Amino acid sequence: MLYSPRLTDQILIVAGEASADLHAARTLHELQRLRPGLTAFGVGGPRLREAGLEALAPAEDISVMGLAEVLPRIPRILGILRMLGRAAAERRPKAALLVDLPDFNLRLAARLKKLGIPVVYYVSPTIWAWRQGRAKQIARVVDRMLCILPFEERFYEGTGVSARFVGHPFAERPPPGTPESYRSALGLPAARTTIAMVPGSRPSELKRLLPPMLEAAERLRAAHPDAQFVVPVAPTLDRAALEPYLAAHRTLEVRLVDGRTEEVVGASDAALVKSGTSTLEAGLMLRPMVVVYKLSWLSYAVARMLVKIAHVALVNILAGRGIVPELLQRDASPERMAAEVERLLGDRAAREAQIAALREVRASLGEPGAPLRVAEEVLGVMR
């Protein structure tokens, strides 16, 4: 059926993983507040759909991490790219808000540019870590680049990209409460040793990270018989996706919580957290943590050749030094995970030093109001 143009303003939004979905949803709320009647279509997760996005495809179909993981999904991903291009040509949105996911969104931006549709890109690609030459491509296809890390804006100087640091969306969050308050909110016993495990929002991350996390939990329980383990289930996942892994540890007390990652980490004495946005989300709760990640051997080999940074964890990058342990690939073993968590549980000086450094990271994220500033940028380019 042919699309019938609406009298209201309409924009295109594309967001992939859970954090991008959350940031985009908050921006859409601000856009609707500033411009009543504004509508949006595109690709998003549950939070964007709840905010009113007309989803032409779910975020889960384009949110894939790692070269080996992407290859079998290429036909579907390219199909969505073509479908969005056709929808944009037909509907002629007044602007596009593309959030993160550079390998997909920069290709889409090139198509939108040919259609004369202004593009606002939210969450800069990590050109400071690898493929700095992408800045030239960005300059050709993006009208406004909105950065969420304080050091990113300067990497665009002299490239022709109109970039602005808008503050980090997580700066909206109030200072964390006590572990006991979060345990009470989650229905957890207040006096027990509590360990959070954050395995990620993608099936591939669950497959690689949850089994060694659960093995580490078994080791920690042996040293702390009162220990309870809590896992937030990302909005992009179903609880059933975790069941096969939990089935191998029936005697281990693992509490699943839908979403609410910050509360789960806030309830913890220490946390195992997958690398990515989750590390910053967890770090803002000012709880000791260990960062872990595993890629396929092929994806990791390619990453080692291309990525030139000293640290992987976002909190370490922002701090400019290693403030939290990073366990990658073979080092992300149950033995190492359990040993690092045990150190944080037992060494008061190590705990306090890490928490003090995380306070510095929290202070570096800018002032609250990022969703409003992004919404204003989108309205500023609308035709």
From Swiss-Prot:
Catalytic activity: a lipid X + a UDP-2-N,3-O-bis[(3R)-3-hydroxyacyl]-alpha-D-glucosamine = a lipid A disaccharide + UDP + H(+)
Pathway linked to the protein: Bacterial outer membrane biogenesis; LPS lipid A biosynthesis
Single GO term (MF): lipid-A-disaccharide synthase activity
Superkingdom of origin organism: Bacteria
First-level EC class: transferase
One GO term (biological process): lipid A biosynthetic process
Record-listed E.C. numbers: 2.4.1.182
Keywords, sorted A to Z: Glycosyltransferase, Lipid A biosynthesis, Lipid biosynthesis, Lipid metabolism, Transferase
GO CC annotation: membrane
InterPro entries reported for this sequence: Glyco_trans_19
NCBIfam families membership: lpxB
Function summary: Condensation of UDP-2,3-diacylglucosamine and 2,3-diacylglucosamine-1-phosphate to form lipid A disaccharide, a precursor of lipid A, a phosphorylated glycolipid that anchors the lipopolysaccharide to the outer membrane of the cell.
Family membership noted in the UniProt record: Belongs to the LpxB family.
Protein name as catalogued: Lipid-A-disaccharide synthase
Species this chain originates from: Anaeromyxobacter dehalogenans (strain 2CP-C)
Lineage, highest ranks first: Bacteria, Pseudomonadati, Myxococcota, Myxococcia, Myxococcales
Gene it is expressed from: lpxB
